[in-house]
């Protein structure tokens, strides 16, 4: 049940809000936990059962970590249990295929359906247990509060990956931080509508271009069409995921739960390192705090620091998908970050901002070809076709892949991914102001809502890309 679906917007969300606000405060967390479980059960009963199991294990584990004098053995056990569940569903087939490539037929290839949100709430649970073991937070005593923290349907499906230390003050329905004022509710509506517009009006339309290009073997397509298709994918990926994140933040505000920002206009970055500080911020910061720093971070010698970066980004790529193209995507980013740390960043700082920005965008685009292609070999074929500027087979024209409307949406996406907001600081401030919009802003939101709902009710929406991760 995508946030941009008819079922969610017209049934699930209004019903959950109505029941939540009609109940007394002491019962509201139970209502929120129940609706969150129903949300996950809609995607599959097995997935909901896995969620309940992991929630129980990590809640009990957190309680035990808070009491034991020697916490490390239990922490390792909890992390291994969480990763075993994630690995069994997400990576077992990939591992078997890799082994079978060397010893054919040795292992059965299992491909169980990945439970909704598993990659996200497993990382949330690991972070919670690690923080309890480190003494950064106290363990949560109330299982309902823990369920709301771990699996609130606003962030459970695709993040942001939340931290208990940030969320704990909001887990009490009677607290001041949980109070929803009129301005806060209006802010939630604004973020929900903006996210819906990003998804339904821009991302889903750009997906039409990419889907057509990706459905044709890269070796047969002219280079300009390959560039068009994967440029559309790059913009689709941003508007799809940042649109989801906006909707998640808006939904959280309705219930008095503030979720962390996950994007800060990443396509405005002037280095790949800066890009990762702006893109999927909750995942990047999770890997920084729970993998990179424990490995030694940047406190080590330069050679070890680079090794740490390669490990972290190989894992980051693997988190995104169980395929070698995802590992290669992560390693490429790790290599680029190593180069920036070895001196490239200092050299770039001598260049005008425009050149640094172009350097970043071009490298991102090239690596996203690997990430977004139907497979690693196809991604390499795309890059080969572009670098050799191949003519492709006859009969493939631009008009067959994108009409004027889609090209205009693609052009608009370049402006709206951050450039307009950077040029108009007042617009950026208005978009993120936690208060009711002005009359002009309200009119704009109504137009976006109308256009977004037109797409939704027409059945032209698709699942969010990050739901598959």
What name fits each language-model region?
Residues 1-468:
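Membrane-embedded transmembrane alpha-helical bundles that form the catalytic cores
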């Amino acid at each position: 049940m995508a946030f941009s679906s008819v079922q969610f917007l017209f049934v699930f969300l209004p019903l959950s809000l109505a029941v939540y606000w009609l109940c007394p405060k002491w019962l509201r967390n139970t209502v929120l936990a129940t609706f969150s479980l129903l949300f996950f059960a809609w995607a599959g009963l097995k997935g909901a059962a896995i969620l309940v199991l992991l929630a129980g294990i990590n809640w009990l584990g957190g309680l035990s970590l808070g009491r034991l004098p020697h916490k490390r053995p239990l922490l390792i056990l909890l992390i291994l249990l969480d990763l075993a569940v994630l690995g069994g569903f997400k990576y077992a087939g990939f591992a078997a295929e890799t082994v079978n490539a060397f010893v054919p037929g040795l292992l059965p290839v299992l491909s169980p359906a990945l439970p909704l949100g598993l990659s996200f709430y497993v990382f949330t649970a690991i972070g919670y247990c690690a923080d309890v073991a480190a003494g950064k937070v106290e363990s949560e005593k109330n299982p309902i509060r823990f369920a709301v923290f771990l699996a609130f349907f606003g962030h459970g499906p695709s993040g942001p990956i939340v931290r208990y230390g940030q969320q704990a003050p909001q887990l009490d329905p009677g607290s001041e931080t949980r109070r929803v004022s009129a301005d806060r509710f209006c802010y939630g509506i604004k973020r929900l509508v903006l996210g819906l517009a990003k998804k339904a009006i821009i991302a889903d339309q750009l997906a039409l271009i990419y889907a057509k290009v990706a459905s044709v073997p890269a070796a047969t397509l002219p280079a300009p069409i390959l560039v068009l298709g994967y440029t559309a994918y790059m913009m689709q990926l941003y508007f799809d995921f940042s649109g989801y994140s906006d909707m998640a933040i808006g939904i959280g505000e309705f219930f008095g739960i503030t979720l962390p920002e996950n994007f800060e206009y990443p396509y405005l970055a002037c280095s790949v390192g800066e890009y990762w500080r702006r893109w999927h911020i909750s995942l990047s910061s999770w890997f920084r705090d729970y993998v990179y720093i424990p490995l030694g971070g940047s406190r080590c010698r330069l050679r070890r620091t680079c090794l740490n970066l390669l490990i972290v980004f190989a894992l980051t790529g693997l988190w995104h998908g169980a395929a070698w193209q995802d590992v290669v995507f992560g390693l490429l980013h790790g290599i680029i970050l190593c180069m920036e740390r070895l001196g490239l960043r200092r050299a770039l700082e001598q260049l005008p901002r425009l050149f640094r920005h172009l350097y970043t965008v071009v490298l991102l685009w090239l690596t996203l070809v690997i990430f977004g292609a139907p497979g690693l070999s196809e991604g390499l074929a795309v890059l080969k076709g572009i670098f050799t500027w191949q003519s492709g087979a006859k009969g493939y024209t631009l008009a067959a892949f994108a009409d004027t409307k889609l090209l205009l949406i693609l052009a608009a996406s370049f402006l709206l991914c951050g450039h307009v907001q950077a040029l108009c600081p007042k617009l950026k401030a208005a978009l993120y102001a936690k208060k009711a919009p002005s009359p002009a802003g309200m009119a704009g939101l109504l137009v976006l809502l109308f256009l977004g709902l037109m797409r939704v009710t027409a059945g032209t929406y698709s699942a969010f890309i990050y739901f598959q991760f």
